[in-house]
Amino acid sequence: QNGPRPIGIPP
């Protein structure tokens, strides 16, 4: 279960 990635981490 993945939450939102922090800004700066590429998708």
Swiss-Prot record:
<keyword id="KW-0873">Pyrrolidone carboxylic acid</keyword>
<keyword id="KW-0646">Protease inhibitor</keyword>
<keyword id="KW-0481">Metalloenzyme inhibitor</keyword>
<comment type="similarity">
    <text>Belongs to the bradykinin-potentiating peptide family.</text>
</comment>
<protein>
    <recommendedName>
        <fullName>Bradykinin-potentiating peptide 11i</fullName>
    </recommendedName>
</protein>
<keyword id="KW-0964">Secreted</keyword>
<dbReference type="GO" id="GO:0090729">
    <property type="term" value="F:toxin activity"/>
</dbReference>
<comment type="function">
    <text>This peptide both inhibits the activity of the angiotensin-converting enzyme (ACE) and enhances the action of bradykinin by inhibiting the peptidases that inactivate it. It acts as an indirect hypotensive agent.</text>
</comment>
<dbReference type="GO" id="GO:0030414">
    <property type="term" value="F:peptidase inhibitor activity"/>
</dbReference>
<dbReference type="GO" id="GO:0008217">
    <property type="term" value="P:regulation of blood pressure"/>
</dbReference>
<keyword id="KW-0800">Toxin</keyword>
<feature type="modified residue" description="Pyrrolidone carboxylic acid">
    <location>
        <position position="1"/>
    </location>
</feature>
<keyword id="KW-0483">Metalloprotease inhibitor</keyword>
<keyword id="KW-0382">Hypotensive agent</keyword>
<dbReference type="GO" id="GO:0005576">
    <property type="term" value="C:extracellular region"/>
</dbReference>
